[in-house]
């Protein structure tokens, strides 16, 4: 099976998003809809051949089920790690529909399900995807927490920009610092449907002190912006990198779930490892 991207100016508008959907309950890998990352990266002056970051998109799936060889349902949670250097991202509704197609499909064991998903998702993304499935019968654990850093949200600021405004970003005089700043106020909208997407965003860096009030205004400026989760994080990373010129930088966002999935993009200059999979309270 070969999955290819649709050759139109913006394939996101040909995706299942915002369209009436017939749900399939038998295995259907053709439901996966890849979208080239380069389409939006070009707006930022980024090329796939010379990425300024490393990272991944960590997906958590909370509504996974299939049948065992005797027809008895199995339920599980799953994580899917999509590398940031994959040629394509996977459109989220198509991902949900694909996972739903396992509901009435029979597999001998969980390893067979994992291998099938890894094969299909890797073909769609154009790079190897790491799949981890945990049946609920094994009592998988999850943790909820907040970053070890400084919350920006109590700053008493005035906001009047609701489209991304890189000019709001600036550094302050002084010695270099290394710190983690975070906010729960990131809100953007789906590129296709306009539905609101809510997230916590975490910025870790080393360099000249970033003006915190300006950073929070910048985060708020995404409020009416239409873009996929992964693209928003890359835009934030790129704008901070250009405007503030930190020595090292990492940007991580944890978006609330939709359709049984949440997406948690992470981008870094390579000096900071991806954080563990601790949920934000709204997840």
UniProtKB/Swiss-Prot annotation:
InterPro entries per the UniProt record, alphabetical: GTP-CH-I_C/QueF, NADPH_dep_7-cyano-7-deazaG_red, QueF, QueF_N, QueF_type2
Disulphide bond pairs: none
Catalytic activity from the UniProt record: 7-aminomethyl-7-carbaguanine + 2 NADP(+) = 7-cyano-7-deazaguanine + 2 NADPH + 3 H(+)
Pathway(s) per entry: tRNA modification; tRNA-queuosine biosynthesis
Keywords for the protein's UniProt record, in alphabetical order: Cytoplasm, NADP, Oxidoreductase, Queuosine biosynthesis
GO molecular function, one term: preQ1 synthase activity
Chief localisation class: cytoplasm
A GO cellular component entry from the record: cytoplasm
Record-linked PANTHER family: NADPH-DEPENDENT 7-CYANO-7-DEAZAGUANINE REDUCTASE
Name of the molecule in the record: NADPH-dependent 7-cyano-7-deazaguanine reductase
Organism in which the protein naturally occurs: Dechloromonas aromatica (strain RCB)
């Amino acid at each position: 099976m070969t999955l290819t991207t649709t050759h139109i100016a913006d394939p996101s508008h040909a995706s299942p998003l915002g369209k009436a959907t017939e749900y399939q309950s038998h295995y259907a890998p053709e439901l996966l809809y890849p979208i080239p990352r380069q389409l939006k990266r070009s707006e930022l002056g980024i090329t796939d051949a010379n990425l300024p970051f490393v990272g991944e998109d960590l997906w958590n799936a909370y509504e996974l089920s299939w049948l065992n060889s005797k027809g008895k349902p199995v339920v599980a949670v799953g994580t899917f790690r999509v590398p940031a250097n994959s040629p394509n991202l996977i459109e989220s509704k198509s991902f949900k529909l694909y996972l739903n197609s396992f509901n009435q499909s029979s597999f001998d064991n969980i390893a067979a399900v994992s291998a099938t998903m890894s094969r299909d998702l890797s073909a769609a993304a154009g790079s190897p995807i790491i799949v981890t499935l945990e049946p609920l019968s094994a009592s998988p654990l999850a943790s909820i927490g907040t970053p070890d850093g400084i919350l920006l949200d109590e700053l008493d600021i005035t906001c009047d920009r609701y489209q991304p405004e890189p000019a709001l970003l600036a550094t302050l005089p002084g010695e270099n610092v290394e710190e983690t700043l975070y906010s729960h106020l990131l809100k953007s909208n789906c590129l296709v449907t306009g539905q609101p997407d809510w997230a916590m965003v975490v910025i870790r860096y080393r360099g000249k002190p970033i003006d915190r009030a300006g950073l929070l205004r910048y985060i708020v400026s995404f409020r009416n912006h239409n873009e996929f989760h992964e693209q928003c994080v890359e835009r934030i990373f790129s704008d901070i990198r250009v405007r503030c010129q930190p020595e090292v930088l990492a940007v991580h966002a944890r978006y609330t779930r939709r359709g049984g999935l949440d997406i948690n993009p992470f981008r870094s200059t390579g000096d900071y490892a991806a954080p563990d999979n601790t949920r934000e309270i709204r997840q």
